[in-house]
């Protein structure tokens, strides 16, 4: 965090010095990550001014801060190398290991300020220890629920052998690597449950399996047949009520056409008395 603060303060100060009315709100985390990478390259032992790509850096800054390209490249070089030097010094100070707290406590006199600092340091440690205890208790309860014949001491042993990993602890109990505690007076572990029995137990307790549905045979209901249509229509007129698919239709003829027909029937013979 100290290095990031140095980068932010140096870049914002340099920009405000040369562009007083610049909008610094556009500088986001992506920009500072890019600037950090550039400064790390400059701080390396193999880097030099010739290897540094000034044009790409200026284009990047110009996209965030309009008018940055008008600043001379020499000033930008000086600012970057000075900032890189400051960052390397800050890293060197951070890498220096602090003195042990025990020696400092013997050298400095006891006071209210030192006691308050010790309390502040011990509070996070106590919280972490309490969190670890809660996790271990939850893991032991889960192991006892999965393995009813397992004792608390055996669950603690399996969890410690697995270094807190529940899956490894379950595998250790299944393999029978846990030795019964004779001092506690509890019964010996009567062998780890078989894998099939364990699976059945877990499925029965934590999983809903509908076995009756697997035994059923699916028989779809046949669709009902619609009654046969007996009425036939042509041009929205009923032509049949018996359901024929074909029908002879006589075309209507005009009166003039009827006059052209010849009647071939023989004339009637009339008898006169």
UniProtKB/Swiss-Prot annotation:
Main location as per UniProt: cytoplasm
Ranges for region Disordered: 92-121
Post-translational modification: Phosphorylated.
InterPro entries, sorted: CUE_CUED2
Boundaries of every CUE domain copy: 135-178
Keywords of the record: Cytoplasm, Nucleus, Phosphoprotein, Ubl conjugation pathway
Disulfide bonds: none
GO annotation, cellular component aspect: cytoplasm; nucleus
Positions in coiled-coil regions: none
Entry's localization field: Cytoplasm; Nucleus
Protein task: May play a role in targeting proteins for ubiquitination and subsequent proteasomal degradation.
Family label: Belongs to the CUEDC2 family.
Protein name (database record): CUE domain-containing protein 2-A
């Amino acid at each position: 965090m100290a290095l990031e603060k140095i980068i932010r303060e140096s870049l914002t100060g340099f920009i405000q010095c040369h562009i007083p009315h610049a909008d610094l709100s556009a500088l986001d985390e992506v920009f500072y990550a890019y600037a950090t990478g550039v400064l790390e390259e400059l701080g390396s032992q193999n880097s030099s001014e010739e290897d540094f790509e000034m044009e790409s850096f200026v284009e990047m800054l110009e996209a965030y801060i309009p008018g940055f390209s008008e600043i001379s490249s020499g000033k930008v070089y000086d600012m970057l190398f000075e900032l890189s030097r400051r960052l390397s010094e800050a890293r060197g100070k951070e890498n220096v290991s602090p003195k042990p707290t025990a020696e400092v406590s013997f050298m400095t006199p006891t006071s209210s300020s030192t006691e308050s600092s010790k309390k502040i340091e011990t509070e996070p440690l106590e919280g972490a220890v309490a969190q670890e205890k809660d996790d271990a208790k939850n893991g032991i309860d889960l192991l006892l629920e999965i393995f009813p014949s397992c004792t608390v001491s055996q669950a603690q042993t399996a969890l410690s052998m697995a270094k807190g990993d529940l899956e490894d602890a379950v595998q250790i109990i299944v393999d029978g690597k846990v030795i019964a505690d004779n001092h506690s007076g509890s019964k010996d572990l009567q062998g780890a449950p078989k894998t099939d029995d364990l699976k059945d137990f877990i499925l029965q307790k934590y999983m809903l399996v509908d076995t009756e549905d697997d035994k059923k045979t699916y028989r779809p209901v046949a669709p009902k047949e619609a009654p046969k249509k007996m009425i036939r229509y042509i041009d929205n007129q009923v032509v049949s009520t018996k359901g024929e698919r074909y029908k002879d239709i006589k075309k209507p003829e005009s009166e003039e056409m009827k006059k052209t027909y010849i009647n071939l029937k023989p004339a009637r013979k009339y008898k006169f008395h």
